[in-house]
Regions:
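Central regulatory/effector-binding core of bacterial HTH transcription factors
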Residues: 1-29, 94
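Alpha-to-beta junction loops
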Residues: 12-22, 41, 104-111, 126-127
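A late-sequence structural motif
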Residues: 130-171
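Hydrophobic residues within well-ordered alpha-helices
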Residues: 12-13, 62, 80, 102-109, ...
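Short helix-loop capping/hinge motifs at secondary-structure junctions, enriched
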Residues: 48-58, 74, 148-154
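Flexible hinge/capping segments at coil-to-helix
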Residues: 30-67
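Secondary-structure junction motif
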Residues: 65-86, 151-159, 168-172
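Short beta-strand->loop
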Residues: 32-42, 124-138
Length: 172
């Protein structure tokens, strides 16, 4: 199930999921977490966006654009706000990365997503990565389970598979 941070945490707290893959795990829930690979967050734009013509794009430039961001409480949104100082209250909130990418493709604004979620679109030049400090913001993906939950043999094997096959060097 692909969902937002709030729902992932609810699933962990209430033992609705054996394992989750997420960004930064919270400290207020007893969890066992292992970082599995880097997760670079990038700024993306429509290929004809004027910012792509600038030699140096700044956060000040981004403030003049329509910003497409995840909902309040999203790990991506929290990270982007923390690292950039951007305030998204007056911009467009979208509840999925796929919808953000589609909105960027339609020329509706600048989006912030995991590079892993847009490799194909970048390769096909459907969207472009904006070169703006402090992006890419490199976080980690974590594989997480509740500390008090006993993992089934299948869940243990899957966890080990993820850890063994998502080495940081392979994906950045």
């Amino acid at each position: 199930d692909v969902t937002n941070r709030h729902d992932l945490l609810d699933n962990l707290k209430n033992n609705k999921a054996d394992l989750v893959i997420m960004g930064e795990p919270p400290k207020n829930i007893p969890l066992i977490s292992q970082a599995s690979m880097k997760n670079p967050l990038i700024a993306i734009a429509h290929p004809e966006n004027e910012l792509l013509k600038k030699e140096k794009v700044t956060i000040k430039d981004l403030k003049k654009e329509t910003l497409l961001t995840r909902e309040v409480g999203s790990g991506t949104r929290i990270t982007v706000e923390r690292f950039t100082g951007l305030n998204f209250n007056s911009d467009i909130q979208i509840n999925s990365n796929e919808a953000i990418v589609e909105a960027v493709q339609a020329g509706l604004g600048i989006g912030f997503v995991s590079m892993h979620s847009v490799n194909l679109q970048l390769k096909n030049k459907i969207i472009k990565q904006l070169d703006v400090e402090p992006f890419p913001i490199v976080r980690q993906w974590h594989i997480v389970h509740h500390a008090e939950a006993e993992l089934s043999p299948i869940a243990r094997r899957f966890k080990q598979f993820v850890i063994n096959n998502t080495r940081v060097k392979k994906y950045l």
